[in-house]
Amino acid sequence: MTILHDKQVQALKLFEKLSVAATGEPVPADQIDERLRNITTLGPNEFFSCFYPDHLEQAKRVYEVFCHAANFDDFVSLAKQARSFMNSTLFAFSAEVALLHREDCRGVIVPPVQEVFADRFIPADSLIKAFTLATTTQPGDESDIIVDVKDTGNILDPEYKLAYFREDIGVNAHHWHWHVVYPSTYDPAFFGKVKDRKGELFYYMHQQMCARYDCERLSNGLNRMIPFHNFNEPLGGYAAHLTHVASGRHYAQRPDGLAMHDVREVDVQDMERWTERIMEAIDLRRVISPTGEYIPLDEEHGADILGALIESSYESKNRGYYGSLHNWGHVMMAYIHDPDGRFRETPGVMTDTATSLRDPIFYRYHRFIDNVFQEYKKTLPVYSKDNLDFPQVTITDVKVKAKIPNVVHTFIREDELELSHCLHFAKPGSVRARYHHLDHESFSYIISAQNNSNADKQATVRIFLAPTYDELGNDISLDEQRRLYIEMDKFYHTLRPGKNTIVRSSTDSSVTLSSVHTFKELLRGEDLVEGQTEFCSCGWPQHLLVPKGNEKGMQFDLFVMLTDASVDRVQSGDGTPLCADALSYCGVLDQKYPDKRAMGYPFDRKITADTHEEFLTGNMNISHVTVRFQD
């Protein structure tokens, strides 16, 4: 066993069966390491939230202790002690942050959260059935147990048409891991490193989630979502049917018609006041610091400053004045049924980064947040032809190579999730949940380009996809459509003088995870190579790269743009980039975001052109692609 493999195995043991009583003897209080002794944390049965300030501060103290450990063995020793008495979710979050940011953990892969906390992904009735089957097997029976995941809703709720997307295991795992890679309490002073454009990435990743959700809504014959816009409006209901096994209690449901109320720490008026102050800062194009200084919201840094302000994170320029609009919104919605805690009810799924994407209100609230960012984008000048053009480079044709040219087929695929690393079934053998998810056929982009110069040109290839028609079958105006464009890929390519053909597989997307490593694979040491690119588990699931489309075939506009890579490139750090798997949504760990352009360029700003033809420059091209769902 290599040193790296040994580290991997030790790390995995920290996450085994966290949802039940910790394995091994608890550490006596007087023997707990003094570095952990004075940290006050949540009780073991409470619901940890990456949005609740007190919980975040507790986790910050824990992961900073882990990161300060003298060496890997010291870290593991501290972590073993911590897991014996700490809240399991708080511990897992803190341990993952440490694994990703400790130098001596380079190459160690964080385990899939869907196996660590399977109870956040698999409905309670399926887990109960698994327990029932496991406890009624004959002694010595080591055969596998497989339970089917049942539906969590029905056709009485129109929103249930989107359950395949909102409740997708890969999507929710991505959201958990993104907030591990980019914790809002990340302190650059402690780590000695600034996470480049972290605030802007917060804006862009969530904007893309909203765009993808609206694409799925149109695929299913639903209207695009109505953004949340009123803190006093009654909200639609949602029931996740998930159980928080560590406490033995359900994530609370939200009945139809409840409105947000004051919680103990924050009033609804605070939320309205923070929104007004942020909007005023956008109108004035500057934010005010605690000392009264003005910080401009310029073209280069404005989105990053706003992202930190709205989330809010440690990089917020003035949290006392601008508050924490995003995080407290999650908390208020999670406790909408018991805002002051008088009934001691558990929160809803909006409290947890591993579950919040299941709730339809997540997308409506984030569209509201995105609308705030769009107000800032309106203050920026419209991209001129000079901002968009790539002199002497033209795209002559764009095609999609699939079984049928320019037609991508989607379908439902069956998959399984191992439960035995989360729960103790008191039997040997595997216990798995069988579920279904959307998937698509593999395809390739074929891009024909012309380099009219006499020298090689380095190009950045940018690929986006958006629906052509709205819910009524009308053409979507370009300025509306720009907010529906989902990024499909972004990569560098060398253009030789003359004609060029660029071929790119959908499986190489800069948006998606290349693969998901299971506990079993990691324990065997698969894909562990010293010095290789580290795997952060952050990235959009490959199976949801393409929207569902419909049975008739739904038309999308495939937009391809070539830009000058010599202008786009940033100066990278030394060595192999870390966590560079899904760089569009997740960036590159410990290095600058690998694109100088604004995230979402060229669709991040208002477009005054009425048609694609009016907007396009020679280095762009539009192709019509059909996405057809096969049931």
Swiss-Prot record:
Glycosylated residues in this chain: 38, 87, 451, 621
One GO CC term, this protein: extracellular region
Binding annotation for Cu cation 2: 326, 330, 366
Cysteine disulfide links: 538-586
Cited Gene3D superfamilies: Di-copper center containing domain from catechol oxidase, Hemocyanin, C-terminal domain, Hemocyanin, N-terminal domain
Matches recorded under InterPro entries: Di-copper_centre_dom_sf, Hemocyanin/hexamerin, Hemocyanin/hexamerin_mid_dom, Hemocyanin_C, Hemocyanin_C_sf, Hemocyanin_N, Hemocyanin_N_sf, Ig_E-set
Tissue: Hemolymph.
Chief location category: secreted
Pfam families, per database record: Hemocyanin_C, Hemocyanin_M, Hemocyanin_N
Domain of life: Eukaryota
One function term, GO molecular function aspect: chloride ion binding
Compartments it resides in: Secreted, Extracellular space
Keywords: Copper, Disulfide bond, Glycoprotein, Metal-binding, Oxygen transport, Secreted, Transport
Annotated Cu cation 1 binding sites: 175, 179, 206
Complex and partners: Tarantula hemocyanin is a 24-chain polymer with seven different chains identified.
Homology family: Belongs to the tyrosinase family. Hemocyanin subfamily.
Free-text function comment from the UniProt entry: Hemocyanins are copper-containing oxygen carriers occurring freely dissolved in the hemolymph of many mollusks and arthropods.
UniProt miscellaneous comment: The two copper ions bound each have 3 nitrogen ligands (presumably contributed by His residues) and share a bridging ligand (possibly contributed by a Tyr residue) in addition to binding oxygen.
Stored PANTHER family: FAT-BODY PROTEIN 1-RELATED, LARVAL STORAGE PROTEIN/PHENOLOXIDASE
Entry protein name: Hemocyanin A chain
Organism: Aphonopelma sp. (American tarantula)
Gene symbol of the encoding locus: HCA
